Each structure stands twice: as C-alpha cells, then as structure tokens.
Design a protein with these regions (language model features):
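Helix-loop-helix junctions and helix-breaking kinks within/between transmembrane helices
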Residues: 156-157, 287
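Short, glycine/acidic-rich beta->alpha junctions
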Residues: 163, 282, 294-295
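Hydrophobic alpha-helical transmembrane segments
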Residues: 68-78, 141-150, 288-296
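Alpha-helical transmembrane segments
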Residues: 8-16, 133-146, 248
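P-loop potassium selectivity filter motif centered on the GYG triad
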Residues: 89-137, 200-290
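Mid-bilayer segments of alpha-helical transmembrane spans in multi-pass integral membrane proteins
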Residues: 106-121, 138-146, 150, 154, ...
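N-terminal alpha-helical transmembrane segments of multi-pass membrane transport
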Residues: 1-108, 129, 152-153, 160-168, ...
Length: 296
C-alpha cells in the first residue's frame, strides 16, 4: 500500500474518531429530551407532527406496545411504497414516462427498503420516476434508518434501567431520529455533494450524439413498459443501432446523502456510488464512506 493510501485511511479514522464524542453527546440529548441546539428550528415541526398525528409525546410505552407501533408503521410503509411503484405511470414527476413496476419487483423493493436491507434488484434510472425515488425510496431511507435507531435506543433504555415497565415512545423516538439527527446531517451532506457535481434536478434525461454508432440488443417491451417474453420465459430483444445516448439525471444528491447516512443499499442509479453522477470526486467518496460509519 502506498503512503498516500495509508494517509487517506489515517485521515478517515482520525475524522471519524473526532466526531464520535460530539455526535454521541448530541444524540444522547436528543433521545433524553434535553436541549440540543436544534430545538428552535426543529421543535415547532416536532410538535406539529405530534398534533397532526395525535401523538402524546409524554406517554410511555411498554415493549409490546412499542413493538406493535413499530410493526404497524413499517407495514403501512410497505403498502404505500408498493402502491406508489405500481401507480407511478399515472402520477406526476415522471418526465421519462416510466410505467408500473412489475408486482414481484415492486414487493421486493418495498420490503427491502422498509427493512433497511442493502439490496437492490432494480435500475432506478431506467425504471423509477422521480416521485417514486423521492416520496418512496428517499422517505424510506429516512424512516427505516430512524426505526432502527429508535429500536436500539429502546433496547439501551431497557438494559440500563434497573426497574422499568416502559422503554419510551416509538413515535417520539422515530420523529426525533428523523428531525434532529438524520435530516440535518443529510442536508449538510447533500449540499457538499451538489457543490462537487452530484446531480440534483427535476429536469429530464439529457441526450447526446455519439461519435460512433453502436449496435446492441434492445429488450422488446409491451404497452405497460414490461419486457415481452418468449416461450422459454426469456426476454425478447431486437438489434438496434444507437446514435445517441440518454444521460439519466434527477434528484440524486438528496437521496444519496440519506442512503449513506442510513446505510441503506438502494440508490438512485443501478451502479450506486460507482456512478459519477452520484460520486464525482475523491472528496465525495471520502464523505460518503464517512457518512456510512458516522452513526452505525
């Protein structure tokens, strides 16, 4: 290994260790309800969420009630994300005109995202609308990570309390994880990514003319945008001469930031952080790796 490589690794661990104490102090104050510096900004939004959702923030839950609330929330998220994928062809923010995601793939993706699983069976840039990417996948990147953080905090409360019939309030832990921890960190990281060239736009794909035409096999799709299969179940293709290339863009930075902070493997592009529109410079690469280890 080169000296430069060792220096980069050393710098990474130095920055990570330097952030452990202040971030840990901050998170402890968030979960114990103490002033943490973001109260004036996020406090009104937190109270508004409680009022709208009918949550009594001072009401404690035992472990059974906590578990039921967690399961109910995530099952609702599973259904919502599945329906969003199936109906995306009829919904706005779909400049490329993508049709509905196949039922099995929609369920696969929904179950993956609500469980914060590092799994991706889709190519987002060629299959999902901007609305699905934002309202579906990005939202689940936040709340699935917040769910895991809430459960860990509840476990810590249960282990550290000598005698306690309650372990907190799931809705409060979920809300505070999102508003006070994940959202501010994601906003800062997204701005850094955009400053380095990560894409963030509602514009449709850009088309550029190739210097030399390329012949390739293109899948044949039906009116719904699904592959047409032959008698053996394989996708039918046709030879096509390509003279231009579509460069997929979209609201990328906002999703990439929480994807790495929440350690959820589903990204905007099929190649994830190996794609130059997600991870264009050495600085963004460093920041994304740091984000993955920062909370986890």
């Amino acid at each position: 290994m080169t000296v430069n490589g060792l220096a980069q690794i050393g710098l990474f661990f130095f920055v990570l260790v330097a952030l452990v104490k202040p971030l840990g102090w901050y998170m402890a104050r968030v979960y114990t309800g103490q002033a943490c510096g973001m109260d004036r900004v996020m406090g009104p939004f937190e109270r508004l969420i409680y009022r709208v959702c009918g949550v009594r923030a001072t009401e404690e839950m035992d472990w059974k009630t906590y578990a039921v609330a967690m399961l109910l929330f995530n099952v609702t998220g599973l259904v919502a994300l599945y329906v969003l994928q199936r109906l995306q062809g009829y919904l706005p923010l779909n400049p490329t005109g993508f049709g509905a995601v196949a039922p099995d793939l929609a369920f696969n993706t929904a179950s993956s995202f609500i469980t914060n699983t590092n799994w991706q069976a889709y190519a987002g840039e060629s299959m999902l609308s901007y609305l699905t990417q934002m309202l579906g996948l990005t939202v689940q990147n936040f709340v699935s990570a917040a769910t895991g953080m809430a459960i860990l905090v509840a476990l810590i409360r249960g282990l550290t309390a000598q005698t306690a019939a309650t372990i907190g309030n799931f809705w409060v832990d979920l809300t505070r994880s999102t508003l006070y921890i994940l959202l501010p960190l994601s906003a800062v990281l997204a701005l850094v990514l955009v400053s380095q060239g990560t894409v963030q736009t509602f514009g449709s794909s850009h088309h550029t003319t190739l210097l030399q035409s390329v012949t390739y096999e293109k899948p044949i799709v039906d009116a719904a945008g699904q592959p047409v299969l032959d008698e053996k179940g394989a996708a039918k293709t046709e030879s096509t001469a390509g003279t231009e290339q579509a460069l997929a863009v979209g609201p990328v930075a906002s999703q990439v930031a929480i994807k790495h902070l929440g350690t959820n493997g589903g990204g905007f592009f099929n190649a994830n952080a190996a794609h130059p529109y997600e991870n264009p410079t050495p600085l963004t690469d460093f920041m994304l790796i740091l984000a993955e280890a920062l909370i986890a």
